[in-house]
Amino acid sequence: MSGMLLESESDHEDSEISSGYSENGRLMSQDPLSLSTGNVMQSRLEQYSKRLSQLGLAATDGDSNGDGTDNDIIPSEYDEEEISVPKQEVPMTTSLILDKLPPTTNEFLHQLSIKEMEQDIEKTVHKIQIKFQPIGSIPLITPSVCTISSQQTFSMIILFLKKRLKVEQVFCYINNSFAPNPQQTIGSLWSQFKVNDELIVSYCGTVAFG
């Protein structure tokens, strides 16, 4: 009886071993297919990665795990139209720039501009020497050389002579040649007809020329 039990147990063990071999054989027969499938997936992932690199996109770890988001994809360069800044020319003398300067700087610029204006005025406005020469019997004024601003008109010289000579009428000429327009500036006449840096003005009580 015991011999029969031993044989049956042995047969059961043999059947389990044989079934294990068959199962292992079946799994081994399936391994090449699984390996082939893994190779295909790996190849596809490599192709996908190459395409991403060609498009200039960076694949993150989230993409490889399949749970990446659109925020993980960063363009390699931005659109120039989106980041372009409109250009506008602004003059340097605008008051907006001056208002943003410190008070001390504004005061310095103000004083500098006043000084420059005074220098320009000194360059354009200067004293001119007038030498008076009487014609005929009209009295000689003393001193015969006077100074006057270059911005004054010739009418001021006529008025000056009338007051000094105490006459109602006087006729004036430049270099004994012509009578200038009373509205002409002294500086203009001096620059054109000066003699030894003096403007020679002849005067008389009656019409002397023409």
UniProtKB/Swiss-Prot annotation:
Residues 1-41, 58-84 are annotated as: Disordered. One of its GO terms (cellular component) is Atg12-Atg5-Atg16 complex. SUPFAM superfamilies: Ubiquitin-like. It is a peripheral membrane protein. Keywords: Autophagy, Isopeptide bond, Membrane, Protein transport, Transport, Ubl conjugation pathway. It comes from the Eukaryota. It comes from Vanderwaltozyma polyspora (strain ATCC 22028 / DSM 70294 / BCRC 21397 / CBS 2163 / NBRC 10782 / NRRL Y-8283 / UCD 57-17) (Kluyveromyces polysporus). Forms a conjugate with ATG5. It is found in: Preautophagosomal structure membrane. GO terms for biological process: autophagosome assembly; autophagosome maturation; autophagy of mitochondrion; cytoplasm to vacuole targeting by the Cvt pathway; glycophagy; piecemeal microautophagy of the nucleus. CDD domains: Ubl_ATG12. GO terms for molecular function: Atg8-family ligase activity; enzyme activator activity; protein tag activity. The keyword Cell cycle does not apply. Its main location: membrane. Ubiquitin-like protein involved in cytoplasm to vacuole transport (Cvt), autophagy vesicles formation, mitophagy, and nucleophagy. Conjugation with ATG5 through a ubiquitin-like conjugating system involving also ATG7 as an E1-like activating enzyme and ATG10 as an E2-like conjugating enzyme, is essential for its function. The ATG12-ATG5 conjugate functions as an E3-like enzyme which is required for lipidation of ATG8 and ATG8 association to the vesicle membranes. Signal peptide: none annotated. Residues 31-41 have a biased composition (Polar residues). Residues 60-72 have a biased composition (Low complexity). There is a cross-link at residue 210 (Glycyl lysine isopeptide (Gly-Lys) (interchain with K-150 in ATG5)). This is Ubiquitin-like protein ATG12. Belongs to the ATG12 family.
